[in-house]
Each structure stands twice: as C-alpha cells, then as structure tokens.
A protein has these predicted regions:
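C-terminal beta-strand-rich structural cap/linker in extracellular carbohydrate-active enzymes
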Residues: 601-621
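Solvent-exposed beta-strand/loop surfaces of large extracellular or lumenal domains
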Residues: 588-604
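N-terminal structural segment of carbohydrate-active enzymes
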Residues: 57-189, 197-199, 204-207, 219-220, ...
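Loop/helix patches that line or flank the sugar-binding groove of alpha-linked glycan CAZymes
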Residues: 65, 81, 128, 146, ...
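Bacterial N-terminal signal peptides
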Residues: 42-51
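Short, solvent-exposed turn/loop segments enriched in Gly/Ser/Thr/Pro and often Arg
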Residues: 74-77, 119-130, 193-203, 328-334, ...
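Alpha-amylase-like alpha-glycosidases and glucanotransferases acting on alpha-linked glucans and related
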Residues: 61-70, 154, 164-180, 205-324, ...
Length: 621
C-alpha cells in the first residue's frame, strides 16, 4: 500500500515510503574451484574475483530444494485486452480483466519464468465507483473512493471478491474458486492480500457467513477508545472529507460529504475528524487493543474482538484453497497479534506462508521471531540500495549490498523477500527510475542470489512495462495504476489477445523475458542459493564502488556472483587461481549457463576478466 510520512508501527517509528539489450560476456572471466560435486558460478558485469571467507550466513534448520519465486499480478489489469485507456475511464470504456482471463495458457506462460507462487492482488471486494447494486452490493460514496476502480487496499467486504473480476457477478466466488483450482492444477500456489490494519469507510459485508458480526456493529461510539471496540472514534465530531481542490471527471460524483458521525480514525493513524488529502482518508483504522492516544497502552487480555474476527477471515480464505497471505503494512499491527494468529491459522494448513510488508529494519527480527512471519519485504535496505545503483545516483555504492547481508539481515537473509518491482514502486523502465529495463539486470541477479529467500516479479516487469501515462487517480507517477481501469501496453503485447504467446513483443522485449526466464531457471534450483553460506570476494584491477562479488556455497555447489553496475566502465582484472584449486586437473571445463557456451580454463594461470558495463555471466564448472 502507498505510504505517507509520520506513521508509527507497533509503537516504533517507520521510515516513510514514497510512493541497449547488450550483454557482453567474456569467455575468460571465470574463477574456478575444484570439487567432486557440481559447481555453479555466476559472473556479473566486469568484475574481478578472488575467494576468501567472510561472514557466514546462518543455515536453515530445514533444507530446501527450490526457491520461492513469486509472480504478482492484478487480475483487473492482467487480463484486460482493452486498449482504450481513457483517464478515469469507466469499466465499460476501459475494460477490466477477469478471473477467467487467467487461463491455463496464461498460467503456463507464468510458469515458464520458473514461478511457483502467484500473488493475486486485488481479489477481495473493495470500495469502487462501479455500481453493482443490482446484485445486492451497496454502492460506495465517491468522496471516500480513490479512483474509479478504487484501491484494492480499502476493503468493503472481507468475505467477498471484487465483482469487477467476474464474468457472472452472481457467481463471482465460484469463478475465484475455479481460478484457485486452475492454479493448483499447474502446480502453482496461490497468495492473496490480507489487509489487517484498516478497512474501507463504507465497510459492510453482504456475504458474511452466519453468526459473523460486522466490524463496528457492537462498538460504543461515545468513547474514543475501548478495548472492546473495533474502531477508534472522535466523539462529537463528524467526518470532514478532504479535497485537493482539483477538478477531475469524478468531481461530478462528489459532494464533499460522507455521513460518518462520529468520525472514525483514519487508516494511517490519523486520530482527527479532518484527515488530509494525502492521508489514507478512504480507510478506517482497526483497533487491535492499542490505545495510541494514551502512551500506546496495550489491552490484549481478554483477546480484542478484532483479533477474533481477523482470525476467522484468514481461516475462511484458507479453506478456499489460498496457500499464503501477503500481509499489508504488517508493522502497523501489534506483534502480539501475529504471534497469536499465525500459529492458529497454520493449524488449518501447516504449509501456509505469511509474508509481511515491512519497512523498519530495527524490528525485522522481532517480526520474524515473535511475530512468526515466514518472510518480510526487503525494501528498506536491499531494494533501496540497488535502486540507487540502477539509477546511477551519485551516492550509489555496493557497500549497501554488503551492509544488508553482513549486518541488517545477518542470520535471517533467507527470510527476506527480494524484488525490484511491485505495485507500490516505480516501474524499472519508467523515466523516473532507470528508463531502460535492461539496466536492472545485475540488480536482479543480486536479488535472486544474495539470500535463499523468495524472489518476486511484478507482471510486466519481464517485458519492460514503463508505467507511462496519466491514468486517472494513479496519475503519471511512473507506476501502473492500482486505482483505475486500465490496459497495460507491454503486457498486452505478451498477452496477445489471450494467446499468451508473446508474439507481439519486439526483439528487445523477448530477450528481456528470456533473460529473466534463464536466470530464474539457474538460481531457483541452486543448492548454493537455497541452503548455502555467503562469502565476500575481494577483487583487484580497476573495480570501483559500482562493482561487487560474492560466493554462495554449500556442500553440493558453489556460486560466484559478480555484478558491475557501472554504466560506462568495463571491468578488467586478472584473477589468480590458487594451486590447490586446480591441482587435480590440468584444466577446468566450464559452461556459461546463460548461453550454454563451454570453455576450458588452463591450470596455473591468471584468468583475465573482461566484462562490459551492465552485463552478466552464469558459469557452471
């Protein structure tokens, strides 16, 4: 979810969050080790390599044989074949993808990228300006909806799916269940969002099971806080809807009013009847038993009603076949809740995974250990450091990579989810980020190999989607809108009218997708990546602060990763191969895995490394 400044999470301040296809490979830029097991070496971008031990990474108690590779997509956007793209356009004008659009062919295309989890974003019924009152769904007020399609993170019914995504609205849940079944049939697992911190101001469940009580139905609205309330209130004051003073096509639907008296606290911890336009004004903060306005005093015994309601919601979707939950703004919910709820839900399915959207490195370990999360975002840290390198910013430095695994996530790097794109972040190919998707390839390699945790792609990333244009509420913000009905141009070329064969992609887009495919083929099953330790490699020659090398190794495999983020300088160096490495062989056969080129390195020599700017190699020997 898009972030704003000044948020606190569980009493701890969070950092704010703002919202040429040339790959030159040198056949000689290889570093060899001798082993009686298979070896894997990945070389990136002009780099010199000499292996010495450094900080060892903590091993898992359980050995894994496959890396989790997640593919995030919004069904509303993913299957939309309409190319009209009118800013603020209606669903009739701009169209919407459906659950049914995610066909067997689509899933096969996703699986080609060596994906094993699909994160379906925006599944749950959320506030929207499209009228489904004919189906018994109460219309939403335009004054508290962002965009015409609405934010997928302003949930209006936790027991329903978004009617936009159904061909037959009456059977929308059955269409979602069929998608889950199709996904599982392809040996893929299903992730959906769990948004625990807030709900839409219009929250009302039309489809809740019997005996389920809506949020706020039994609240005492005369008090600002009660441990038994679901919401926080501003007694005696009605809500004042914010405005930015700008006219849009949606202005005719807005009257500047929303009937909420007393006003409820806003989702980003704003305890005021007059939230600002930049606040999450369309949402209501849920009460987990923390009195934020009185020294954040906690009331967790007896169990707060919201805890019980949220447990039941998670179990409901687990019974639908969901295999895991990406938990929105996990740090804005008390650790005690996660410690309580995750084990309970895992009693229903022990193989469930919980991924926390997290931005405060100071509490990462706490949310993993006490909070029981399986994985956390590595946004503040690796993503931010890699983005600086990709953008060629003056303060970019590979020491940020070193800091991540040696300090920030030392001992739990395999619990960190690495990515370069998601719905909150700028598209790599956007003008504000890199301007060219290929410039991020060394960073993608580092993301996929630095730890054994999950790696994630955002749909369209693999074909260089630029997130360009004025979409509506999303604006021209270098992202693909999550608030509007929209077609995603580069992705639509791969979709090719539902054939999902990529025949409309140009050569550069096809090459980019193939690169992602080959890289993840190599890394997703690498024992060194999944279960190995990590060593930093000191280098010589002309290496600078835009070049980095490290080794991932296990008893079965060793992996050398060399990355050159420098846009201009070719890396040139000689690597001295120690005698003990090559003493059993007169030469070392190697295979460059991205091209399947087979090479031999003579024994007892220095190996010249020559790698062009922004290039990579994957070499097995």
């Amino acid at each position: 979810m898009r972030k704003v400044k000044g948020i606190k999470a569980d009493g701890i301040g969070l950092k704010s969050k703002t919202l040429s296809d040339r790959r030159c490979y040198s056949a000689q830029s290889l570093f060899a080790f001798e082993s009686n097991k298979s070896w894997l070496l990945i070389l990136f971008f002009n780099f010199i390599i000499i292996p010495i031990s450094s900080f060892a990474q903590k091993k898992r108690t359980k050995m894994n044989d496959k890396q989790i590779v997640i593919y995030q997509l919004l069904p509303r956007l993913f299957g939309n074949k309409n190319t009209t793209n009118i800013p603020y356009g209606t669903i009739q004008q701009n169209g919407s993808g459906k659950f049914n659009d995610i066909t067997d062919k689509a899933l096969d295309g996703i699986k080609e990228l060596h994906v094993n989890y699909v994160w379906y974003t925006g599944v749950l019924a959320h506030a929207s300006l499209t009228d489904y009152s004919a189906y018994g769904i109460k219309p939403d007020d335009a004054d508290v909806v962002k965009g015409r399609a609405g934010s997928p993170y302003a949930i209006r019914d936790y027991y329903d799916v978004d009617p936009d995504l159904a061909v037959d609205v009456k059977n929308r849940m059955k269409e979602f269940e069929a998608l889950v079944k199709r996904t599982h049939a392809k040996n893929l697992k299903v992730l959906i969002d769990f948004i625990p911190n807030h709900v839409a101001r219009s929250y009302h469940s039309d489809t809740k099971p019997k005996n389920v009580i809506d949020f706020g139905a039994n609240d005492d609205v005369t008090v600002a806080f009660s441990p038994r309330n679901d919401f926080y209130y501003i007694p005696g004051q009605p809500l004042v809807v914010p405005t930015n003073g700008q006219k849009t096509p949606l202005s005719v639907l807005q009257d500047g009013k929303f009937d909420e008296n007393p006003a409820k606290a806003t989702g980003n911890n704003v305890f005021s009847a007059q939230p600002k336009y930049d606040d999450w004004y369309e949402t209501i903060k849920l009460n987990y038993g923390v009195d934020y306005q009185n020294s954040e005093k906690q009331y967790f015994d007896p169990i707060p009603p919201v805890w019980l309601k949220m447990r039941d919601i998670l179990i409901f979707w687990t019974h639908k076949g969901v295999d895991g939950f990406r938990c929105d703004m996990a740090e804005m919910v008390p650790i005690a809740f996660w410690n309580w709820v995750i084990p309970q839900v895992k009693k229903v399915n022990p193989d469930l995974i919980f991924i926390g959207e997290a931005y405060n490195p100071k509490v990462y370990k706490q949310y993993l250990d006490e909070g029981k999360f399986d994985y956390l975002y590595d946004k503040v840290g690796l993503y931010d450091g890699l983005k600086r390198l990709i953008r060629n910013e003056p303060n970019a430095d590979v020491k940020d990579i070193r800091f991540i695994w040696q300090q920030e996530s030392a001992g739990f790097g395999h619990h960190m989810l690495r990515f370069l794109e998601n719905h909150d972040e700028e598209r790599i190919a956007s003008a504000a980020f890199a301007g060219k998707a290929e410039l991020a390839l060394p960073a993608m390699v580092v993301s996929a190999t630095l730890g054994g945790g999950p790696v994630m792609l955002y749909f369209g990333q693999e074909v260089g989607e630029p997130g360009k244009g004025q979409e509506g509420f999303g604006g021209d913000d270098n992202r693909t809108t999550i608030f509007d009905y929209w077609g995603v141009p580069n992705h639509q070329k791969w979709m090719n009218g539902g054939l999902f064969d990529g025949h409309k992609l140009n050569g550069a887009q096809q090459n980019l997708r193939n690169y992602y495919k080959q890289l993840l083929k190599v890394t997703s099953k690498s024992d060194a990546v999944l279960n190995g330790k990590i060593y930093e490699v000191p280098v010589t020659g002309n290496m600078n602060n835009r070049m980095y090398a490290f080794i991932r190794y296990s008893g079965k495999q060793r992996l050398l990763v060399v990355a050159n983020f420098d846009r201009n300088q070719t890396l040139s160096a000689n690597i001295e191969i120690p005698d003990q490495v090559l003493k059993a062989k007169s030469s070392v056969p190697v295979t460059e895995l991205l091209t399947d080129k087979k090479l031999n390195i003579p024994a007892g020599t220095n190996i010249p490394v020559t790698l062009a700017p922004v290039s990579a190699q994957v070499i097995e020997f």
